[in-house]
């Protein structure tokens, strides 16, 4: 009988650990929803790959500086704020500037 209660406690502990691990952010690919596109008031065409690339720039910038509002400020106005440009510079994306500007035009219709 004692062994059964130990096994039950162990199973409960494992279940708790698994559920806690599921609640943590993972290193899985960044999932971008169409809802985010409209929340940012982007007026262009929703393309998940392009939107994810632009969003990833803001995510990387946030990870670099760890400023709480930076991610939101970077994405504001469909990636057209000076914060987004500052993030591009901080991440040394000079050689991709034209391509990124075209992406912003595509999703944002500036």
From Swiss-Prot:
Look up the domain of life of the source. Eukaryota
- Name positions with the PTM Valine amide: 107
Entry keywords, A to Z: Amidation, Cleavage on pair of basic residues, Disulfide bond, Hormone, Neuropeptide, Secreted, Signal
* Cysteines joined through disulfide linkages: 42-78, 58-74, 61-87
Its localization reads: Secreted
Q: Name one GO biological process term.
A: neuropeptide signaling pathway
Q: Which InterPro entries match?
A: Crust_neurhormone_CS, Crust_neurohorm, Crust_neurohorm_sf, Hyperglycemic
The question of whether Kinase is a record keyword is answered with no
- The protein in question is named CHH-like protein
Q: Which organism is it from?
A: Bombyx mori (Silk moth)
């Amino acid at each position: 009988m004692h062994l059964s209660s130990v096994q039950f406690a162990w199973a409960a502990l494992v279940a708790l650990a698994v559920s806690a691990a599921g609640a943590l952010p993972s290193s899985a690919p960044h999932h971008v929803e169409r809802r985010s596109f409209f929340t940012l008031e982007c007026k262009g065409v929703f393309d998940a790959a392009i939107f994810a690339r632009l969003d990833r720039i803001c995510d990387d910038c946030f990870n670099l500086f760890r400023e709480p509002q930076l991610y939101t400020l970077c994405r504001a106005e469909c990636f057209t704020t000076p914060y987004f440009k500052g993030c591009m510079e901080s991440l040394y994306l000079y050689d991709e500037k034209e391509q990124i500007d075209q992406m912003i035009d595509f999703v944002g219709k500036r």
